[in-house]
Regions:
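Cleavable N-terminal export/targeting peptides
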Residues: 1-56
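Short loop/turn motifs that connect adjacent beta-strands in outer-membrane beta-barrel proteins
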Residues: 54-63, 98-112, 126-128, 143-149, ...
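Residues that define the transmembrane beta-barrel architecture of outer-membrane proteins
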Residues: 62-64, 84-90, 128-134, 148, ...
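Transmembrane beta-barrel strands of outer-membrane/channel proteins
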Residues: 66-74, 114-120, 152-158, 194-198
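Surface-exposed strand-loop-strand hairpins of Gram-negative outer-membrane beta-barrel proteins
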Residues: 72-90
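Sequence/structural signature of outer-membrane beta-barrel proteins
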Residues: 73-79, 101, 119-125, 141, ...
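Outer-membrane beta-barrel "beta-signal"
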Residues: 92, 213-226
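Residue-level signature of outer-membrane beta-barrel architecture
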Residues: 96-98, 140-142, 182-184, 224
Length: 226
């Protein structure tokens, strides 16, 4: 009996070329395997930096943000308030992306972010007074696939001010916020940030009077992502 030998040459993962002693070449399919090589290759192709994929395709879990913004707020007499209160405002905030991109395949695809904001300002009308506040926010960043990343958020926190009657009467106030805006990325991890929003100040009846202060604000600044 004559024994035939077959030599195998690996040409790529998933197939091989077999050559018999008679010179015939046979292509064989190999079953896929979960080898260390394949796992290492998959690992090295994972995205790096702040993005889950390309720029604008959503943020990676754990990405942090630092924002510095300035602007103003125009008051209006509504919901019981008797005066329009106008402010010059500054804000610094820190954020953290809670998880992976959600809503894949839908227009609302994006990331949830928690933020802590410290803001301060000077009331310029109807009188000169000060205002400071600390507010946690829940923000949603839309993954558009472009350098324009819109967002929307809600916040509720505490404030201190020396604004007095007729609309407030105590130093301690709560603040409620609803905001929307956009990040425009100048480079991979730095964006211009513009936002507009509504802010309400009142003490929930702890002091009297408690008519409340209502404003519409606009802020412009920069945000670092890391």
């Amino acid at each position: 009996m004559t024994m035939k030998t077959i030599e195998f040459t690996l040409i790529f993962v998933g197939s091989a070329l077999a050559t018999s002693s008679e010179g015939a070449e046979i292509e064989l399919a190999l079953a896929p395997t979960d080898s260390k090589f394949e796992r290492a290759a998959a690992f090295t192709t994972q995205p790096t930096g702040i993005w889950q994929g390309e720029v604008g395709e959503g943020f990676r879990p754990g990405v942090q943000t630092l924002s510095l913004e300035a602007g103003g707020a125009g008051g209006f007499a509504a919901f019981g308030g008797r005066q329009a209160h106008d402010f010059a405002l500054t804000s610094v905030s820190y954020g953290y992306m809670l998880g992976k991109v959600v809503g894949e395949g839908h227009w609302y695809r994006g990331n949830w972010e928690i933020r802590g904001e410290l803001f301060g300002g000077l009331q310029v009308s109807p009188s000169r007074n000060w205002l400071v506040g600390l507010t946690p926010h829940l923000r949603y960043n839309f993954a558009t696939g472009t350098r324009w990343i819109p967002f929307a958020d809600l916040g509720a926190g505490v404030s201190a001010t020396d604004i007095g009657p007729p609309d407030t009467s105590g130093t301690f106030e709560f603040n409620l916020q609803a905001n929307t805006g956009v990040h425009w990325f100048l480079r991979d991890n730095l964006a211009l940030t513009f936002e507009v929003g509504y802010m309400h100040l009142s003490c929930a009846g702890i002091h009297k009077p408690n008519l409340g202060i209502n404003t519409l604000k606009g802020l412009l600044g920069v945000t670092w992502f890391f």
